[in-house]
């Protein structure tokens, strides 16, 4: 699909290295007729189609493709999916999602353990050390209500009170994300997997944000 559409897909050659992968499989479990559920230890949502669609929105997915009559029927009944076209046995739906949003939810600040403590925790199997993934996983079903955000140096992070975000000229590549916003100074969620090598120009962040994304505070438009 990426080859012919020039559009990325949720699964790819290196996607197992992404911190979004567990959340992808949880979402798929609600959308597929016979989900593979390959990652152990996760609470899957088998056959809970509406919840799966909600997760697509949270993950910033643009399109959903069905290829069985049963799943196509569920997709047609969903108010959050828009049929674009069908070409048997496939039907392509638009997902009502966005790549950049303001964070309006309650914020739960996560304080990262010291590097040496994290290493010792891994070696000794010490489960008392806080882990960002655990906190993000626990709140995956509550993304409309709260976000877990990792900050350092005691920085004060607050939710946005605005509801009229306008994003223009959004451009996402493998090594650069750029956009214009009408809400400088507000906390923006970027639905791209967090990685510590990302750096920001004209703003603060990026901050690791649940479930597995980044957030930034632009200094200007």
Task: Please annotate each region the language model reported.
Residues 97-105, 188, 221:
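Short, charged/polar, Gly/Pro-enriched secondary-structure boundary elements
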Residues 1-58, 99, 105-159, 196:
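Extracytoplasmic/lumenal acceptor-recognition loop(s) of multi-pass membrane glycoenzymes
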Residues 13-14, 87-88, 96, 210:
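Residues at the C-termini of beta-strands that transition into short coil/loop
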Residues 92-94, 217:
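Short, well-ordered beta-strand micro-motif
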Residues 28-88, 186-193:
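Periplasmic/luminal catalytic loop of GT-C fold multi-pass membrane glycosyltransferases
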Residues 144-221:
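Active-site-proximal, structured, solvent-exposed surfaces of multi-pass membrane proteins
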Residues 82-91, 100-101, 107:
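Structured beta-strand-rich cores of soluble
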